[in-house]
Amino acid sequence: MDPLGAPSQFVDVDTLPSWGNSCEDQLNASEIAAETYQEETIRSPFLYNKDINGKVVLWKGDVALLNCTAIVNTSNESLTDKNPVSESIFMLAGPDLKEDLQKLRGCRTGEAKLTKGFNLAARFIIHTVGPKYKSRYRTAAESSLYSCYRNVLQLAKEQSMSSVGFCVINSAKRGYPLEDATHIALRTVRRFLEIHGETLEKVVFAVSELEEATYQKLLPLYFPRSLKEESRSLPCLPADIGNAEGEPVVPERQIRISEKPGAPEDNQEEEDEGLGVDLSFIGSHAFARMEGDIDKQRRLILQGQLSEAALQKQHQRNYNRWLCQARSEDLSDIASLKALYQTGVDNCGRTVMVVVGRNIPVTLIDMDKALLYFIHVMDHIAVKEYVLVYFHTLTSEYNHLDSDFLKKLYDVVDVKYKRNLKAVYFVHPTFRSKVSTWFFTTFSVSGLKDKIHHVDSLHQLFSAISPEQIDFPPFVLEYDARENGPYYTSYLPSPDL
């Protein structure tokens, strides 16, 4: 809170000049008359609209300082990104914001999630995750960035918000070209205001000094402040201006349907003349060959009539898709948790893999990415026999993997994972975890039931795995020594855990 009598650091959006008021070359009556003919013959798809321009504000400043209904925070999937926008928001909002984020279970790319503003002037914070940009996946990145802006605006509409302060969602860390991203941001907001303009009074683009020039350059294309500016901006519009809502359009993916499929066309004779071309190649391509009825295959699976070999082949194809994605995805944020790692071998010479439950913030990470990381690490391990050591030590409700995720993991992984897994050592279980494990292995994945071994102390674990063969997190050793007494004083924990 500001000291008594001191000026507030927050900025009321109603005091900021709108984009429409910043025009320096307003047209007089004679100029409008001179352009009437041009106006009637060719107009921009983004028409001059004084009312819409009055709702838009370009402001150079920190979005966290805006006094409006909601501001936008750009982050990563776990909502823990360290970028200037997020750090400023977290600093001003106070510690309660971090506690509130624990309940959100992260946020997928393109999604938008809502929290309170706490100590901010803004009543709410809308969190979203911009895409990582790679030129070969440009279309996917464009669609994801569009979804960010669209979902933020949709959430604002659903919550009856009167004003929203946007930061630049495409952070430099994610590599999205600023100008390309600005086109998507501006046209998405423009189209939303055209359709749902009555719900929002102000949309503020809060930009840095580096970003301001790009926004100044592109705003006239989507929010022309006069007929003259509209006309002048028309040649500068990109070829792809999206659909009626600003969403990127990929022509090759559009389904083309004849207006009157059953009616003869007026130029049928001209079309008939073109039928002399060689059509013999049609159907020769792989994609044009007849395949089995997919729906029929699914029915057969449900009825248990599809062969075991066909089921295995289908499962292998699915696993290979996950594996390809795991090898191409940036999983550094999951790796940094140090929740899964390879250590030594057990007394039978089998590879030991360690899972640290306390290092898995289930509510803050993208669990699909966690599954991808598991596949990325385990694919080459599972080709031979291995064992898993799971430390349940000092876990909280935010660390517990739900049964749906575990069942999905079990169903997705290749058969070699199940065949070569010889034991799962569940270290420091609680009564609740024992009951949950029994239900899960009895009713969901019965193939695991005989491989689960509950281990109450590390001393019991050492009968199967020598202590020198495991890298222990320090808190596991401290907890076990406190609960079960010291037993192996010469062992030192790994400094990396």
From Swiss-Prot:
Residues 43-223 form the Macro domain. InterPro entries: CRAL-TRIO_dom, CRAL-TRIO_dom_sf, Macro_dom, Macro_dom-like, Macro_GDAP2. Residues 253-263 have a biased composition (Basic and acidic residues). It comes from the Eukaryota. Keywords: Phosphoprotein. Residues 251-273 are annotated as: Disordered. Residues 333-481 form the CRAL-TRIO domain. The modification Phosphoserine is found at S280. The keyword Phosphoprotein applies. The keyword Isomerase does not apply. Transmembrane segments: none annotated. Pfam families: CRAL_TRIO_2, Macro. Belongs to the GDAP2 family. This is Ganglioside-induced differentiation-associated protein 2. The lineage of its organism: Eukaryota, Metazoa, Chordata, Craniata, Vertebrata.
